[in-house]
């Protein structure tokens, strides 16, 4: 990510400068900044991530100004608005010090759902980001699971979705039986030894108090 993202940003910045009236250029520039922002969040680089958030919002708003039909652009804007509102106090103080725009939880979620329902390019990414939001912030576990199961149905060869379903069933619903079935399906899908799967099944055995998992 750290190697390829700068190249993507350089290329899309050049594209936007070369064709400033091309909505797609600004849309993909926002996407390139988004990749770097996620990488910075994972590395706890809050200052850089906050600045990238502003760049994402600006690029996508410019794309929409050039082409209001570009529904996908609403997703990144909504994501910024949502997290800017639900962020911890320290992050909000950082935003204030950097003179970054404020957020709105309700409108941000509305924008994300609008992009998900009307767009085509970002459906899977939107569902993945939304399941995190529903799980962690909206406390709507059934909706999060519904999105994960939809991702699993559309991307059956990606084992991540099965793993997340199993973890959610266990941690949030305390449905050990359902979690057991999902972990076993994941083991079958991977068809081999996997340390993470063994740990998951071992935890289920501990919770059930037997070795029938």
Model features per residue range: what roles?
Residues 1-69, 75-142:
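Short coil/linker segments at helix-helix boundaries
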Residues 19-20, 48-49, 139-142, 173-181, ...:
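Structural helix-adjacent loops and short alpha-helical linkers that scaffold large soluble proteins
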Residues 26-29, 33, 59, 74-77, ...:
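TPR/Sel1-like alpha-solenoid repeat signature
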Residues 57, 63-65, 155-176:
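C-terminal intrinsically disordered extensions
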Residues 88-91, 120-128, 155-163, 191-200:
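Generic helix N-cap/helix-start motif at coil->alpha-helix transitions
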């Amino acid at each position: 990510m750290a190697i390829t993202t700068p190249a993507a940003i350089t290329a899309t910045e050049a594209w936007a400068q070369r064709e400033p009236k091309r909505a797609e250029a600004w849309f993909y520039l926002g996407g390139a900044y988004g990749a770097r922002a996620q990488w910075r969040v994972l590395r706890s680089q809050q200052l850089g991530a906050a600045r990238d958030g502003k760049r994402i919002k600006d690029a996508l708003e410019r794309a929409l100004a050039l082409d209001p039909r570009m529904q996908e652009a609403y997703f990144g804007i909504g994501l910024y608005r949502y997290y800017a509102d639900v962020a911890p106090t320290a992050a909000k103080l950082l935003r204030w010090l950097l003179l970054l725009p404020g957020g709105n939880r309700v409108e941000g979620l509305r924008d994300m759902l609008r992009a998900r329902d009307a767009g085509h390019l970002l459906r899977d990414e939107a569902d993945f980001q939304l399941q995190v939001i529903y799980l962690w912030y909206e406390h709507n576990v059934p909706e999060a699971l519904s999105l994960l199961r939809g991702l699993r149905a559309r991307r059956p060869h990606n084992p991540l979705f099965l793993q997340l379903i199993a973890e959610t069933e266990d941690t949030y619903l305390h449905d050990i039986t359902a979690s057991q079935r999902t972990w076993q399906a994941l083991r079958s899908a991977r068809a081999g030894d996997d340390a993470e799967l063994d740990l998951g099944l071992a935890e289920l055995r501990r919770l059930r108090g037997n070795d029938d998992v």
